[in-house]
């Protein structure tokens, strides 16, 4: 939601900006525990949906704070307030038994790849994307509920 404040009354603009900032902080605080539970559910489904050979890829699935994520997972170009500051990733910078970084292996399993013979294609199993899709509506409901709760407090105060 965008809001343009263009008024010259006696402190009204400052009061509104302060209240909007307070609402934003309250929504973020309200979301903290709910999102932690939501991420755990996504993680559990990603692990359950991950194809298992040795189990190394499955055991590498984890939730990380977005600010500490590997560079290729950094989100840029977005404006606005960050409400979800975590991401779910699989793989690591460690090498697997073939000397290939696990991150590349995770991408190949998740997104698919051409087999070594060059004649067949492994279609991939998007276990991370599917786990997020399973819980997408739930996330939308969590965000809407937290926003509605905070805005109802504001209307009660007025």
What are the language-model segments listed below?
Residues 1-86, 95, 102-158:
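Short, Lys/Arg-rich flexible segments
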Residues 91, 96-97:
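Acidic, low-complexity protein-protein interaction segments
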